[in-house]
């Protein structure tokens, strides 16, 4: 039977570091479960593993689409299933690491995404509307999905509306459970509120030092400021700075505030998942890593 280990939790909690530690211990690649890391060139702002980290540990399911491509949870599940099958044939477990709840749930036996193909004409009509107007429309048509999607996430807002308007039913009502043909261990990496805020602030400044602002300038010049991905968390705030609507200090503060809000929504999502085993991060990184290895070894031996 297939065996899948999931490492999940809010942004900046330390999932990636733990995932790499487990990958090295198990001798398997990290299968990323991040809805923005799938896109090429969106690197620093998505906290994509660096080249050095990718040399140390193989990462799959990153850089699989261009920023102008349509990519959704159904396509992600297709790619993830192929990687899981490949690892199973090699007698190895799959290690999924990320904070995109929909991606993780679709792969781990939760949601079966509705098979609604893209509608270019409908997308063109939606693209000319203001993002806040689209979000308000989604709140009316599908309040459950709207509650799970950030108001700045244009890609997911447009997709949810596309499904609603194409089928006449809310996206949230069309998801169904898929049958499990594997065993699953889900490990949650959380953090206390103050510690998480501190990590978010530190990570934001590290990203700026690593060249995030230059990345945004490059992407805006190459694809134009209206590229939907440039309206997502962090890229939108730095775009406002480049347009001289905020100074840099205000842009960074807004990134921290919005990231905290996003992390809170992620925690709400993952806390509602019944099968997640939460690790005690307050015991320190070394203890956390040892706890995770012990749980994984028991799971694989079972």
Swiss-Prot record:
Site, Interaction with substrate tRNA: residue positions: 100
Pfam families assigned: IPPT (PF01715)
Top-level division of the source organism's lineage: Bacteria
Region: Interaction with substrate tRNA, residue numbers: 34-37
InterPro entries in alphabetical order: Dimethylallyltransferase, IPT, P-loop_NTPase
Annotated catalysed reactions: adenosine(37) in tRNA + dimethylallyl diphosphate = N(6)-dimethylallyladenosine(37) in tRNA + diphosphate
One example of a Gene Ontology biological process annotation: tRNA modification
Reported cofactor(s): Mg(2+)
Keywords in alphabetical order: ATP-binding, Magnesium, Nucleotide-binding, Transferase, tRNA processing
Stored SUPFAM superfamilies: P-loop containing nucleoside triphosphate hydrolases
Residues annotated as binding ATP: 9-16
Family matches, as Gene3D superfamilies: 1.10.20.140, P-loop containing nucleotide triphosphate hydrolases
Binding site for substrate: 11-16
The EC number(s) this enzyme carries: 2.5.1.75
One of the record's GO molecular function terms: tRNA dimethylallyltransferase activity
Oligomeric form and interacting partners: Monomer.
NCBIfam families registered for this protein in UniProt: miaA
Family the entry assigns: Belongs to the IPP transferase family.
Protein function: Catalyzes the transfer of a dimethylallyl group onto the adenine at position 37 in tRNAs that read codons beginning with uridine, leading to the formation of N6-(dimethylallyl)adenosine (i(6)A).
Protein's name according to its UniProt entry: tRNA dimethylallyltransferase
Lineage of the organism: Bacteria, Bacillati, Cyanobacteriota, Cyanophyceae, Gloeobacterales
């Amino acid at each position: 039977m297939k065996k899948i280990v999931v490492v999940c939790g809010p942004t900046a909690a330390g999932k990636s570091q733990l995932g790499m530690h487990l990958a090295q211990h198990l001798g398997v690649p990290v299968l990323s479960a991040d809805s923005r890391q799938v896109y090429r060139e969106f690197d620093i702002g998505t906290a994509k593993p660096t080249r050095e980290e990718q040399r140390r540990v193989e990462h799959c399911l990153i850089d699989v689409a261009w920023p102008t491509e349509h990519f959704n949870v159904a396509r992600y599940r297709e790619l993830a299933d192929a990687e899981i099958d490949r690892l199973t044939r090699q007698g190895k477990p799959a290690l999924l690491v990320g904070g995109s709840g929909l991606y993780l749930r679709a792969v781990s036996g939760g949601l079966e995404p509705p098979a609604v193909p893209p509608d270019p004409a409908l997308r063109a009509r939606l693209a000319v509307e203001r993002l806040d107007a689209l979000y308000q429309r989604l709140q009316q048509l599908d309040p459950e999905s709207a509650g799970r999607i950030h108001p700045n996430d244009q890609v997911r807002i447009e997709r949810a509306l596309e499904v609603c308007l194409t089928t006449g039913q809310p996206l949230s009502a069309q998801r169904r459970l898929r049958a499990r043909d594997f065993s699953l261990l889900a490990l949650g990496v959380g953090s206390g509120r103050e510690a998480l805020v501190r990590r978010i602030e530190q990570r934001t400044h590290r990203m700026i030092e690593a060249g995030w602002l230059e990345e945004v300038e490059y992407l805006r010049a190459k694809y134009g400021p209206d590229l939907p991905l440039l309206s997502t968390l962090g890229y939108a705030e730095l775009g406002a700075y480049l347009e001289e609507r905020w100074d840099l200090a205000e842009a960074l503060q807004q990134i921290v505030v919005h990231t905290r809000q996003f992390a809170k929504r992620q925690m709400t999502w993952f806390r509602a998942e019944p099968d997640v085993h939460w690790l005690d991060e307050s015991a320190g990184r070394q203890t956390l890593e040892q706890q995770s290895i012990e749980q994984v070894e028991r799971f694989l031996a079972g």
